[in-house]
């Protein structure tokens, strides 16, 4: 009887996980994608605030989409009696860029570590070789996502940030130690998570450009230069495009 109750509770839990996965993917991620796609389809017509908002949302949208699919697959597999490995572990709770990658798409990062990074020598070599190994692994990760130069640029950008983070680890520790915020662990953790998310989102400009067939240069130019008129002016461009595309009823009016 006890075994039956436990099995029933696990089945309910797995069904809830599948439901949460569908919610993340179809309710949250797909609706975010409406706005992001509008912005990235015509980056030259958008201003800085909207490009920044779309880029920051894209990182969250990608996580909700990928992790939602994983939740559905893991929940369904457990109902059938199979255990699948977890693929995401709260990546945006990471306080460093390296920590985020230890929590993001763990099946891919584990494969890259075991079959490329470690055979190349990993961190068991001199500093220059170690940094080169890091760049190679991230470049391969970019090409794994697709045969597009923008995916390769995304991988290289991730690799460069990882290398800089590793080389600046000691100086950053000193800076944090003498920073007044160091005495407030909660504030320090919050700021580190925000910085990590911003860095990750910066690299995602290349990834999003590959998905929506945009030019990364136009996106970065708009982010750096297009702040005239603020968010409202850019939102007007988005709603005008939505109206002309016949999907204005699916976008919120502000």
Residue spans for each PLM region:
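Positively charged, low-complexity/disordered segments
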Residues: 1-7
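Membrane-embedded transmembrane alpha-helical bundles that form the catalytic cores
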Residues: 8-252
């Amino acid at each position: 009887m006890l075994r039956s109750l436990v099995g029933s509770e696990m089945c309910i839990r797995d069904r809830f996980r599948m439901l949460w996965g569908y919610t993340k993917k179809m309710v949250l991620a797909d609706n975010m994608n409406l706005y992001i796609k509008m912005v990235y389809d015509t980056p030259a017509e958008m201003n800085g605030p909207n490009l920044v908002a779309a880029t920051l949302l894209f990182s969250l949208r990608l996580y909700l989409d990928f992790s939602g699919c994983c939740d559905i697959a893991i929940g369904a597999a457990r109902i059938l009696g199979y255990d699948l490995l977890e693929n995401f572990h709260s990546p945006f709770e990471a306080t460093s860029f390296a920590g985020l990658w230890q929590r993001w798409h763990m099946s891919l990062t584990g494969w890259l570590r075991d079959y490329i990074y470690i055979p190349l020598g990993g961190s068991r070599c001199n500093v220059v070789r170690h940094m080169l190994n890091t760049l190679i692994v991230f470049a391969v990760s970019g090409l794994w996502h697709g045969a597009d130069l923008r995916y390769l640029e995304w991988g290289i950008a991730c690799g460069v940030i990882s290398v800089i983070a590793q080389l600046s680890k000691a100086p950053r520790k000193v800076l944090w130690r003498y920073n007044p915020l160091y005495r407030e662990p909660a504030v320090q953790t919050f700021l580190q998570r925000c910085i990590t998310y911003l860095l990750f989102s910066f690299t995602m400009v290349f990834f999003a450009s590959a998905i929506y067939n945009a030019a990364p240069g136009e996106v970065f130019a708009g982010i750096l230069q297009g702040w005239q008129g603020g968010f409202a002016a850019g939102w007007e461009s988005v709603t005008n495009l939505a109206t002309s595309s016949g999907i204005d009823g699916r976008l919120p009016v502000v």
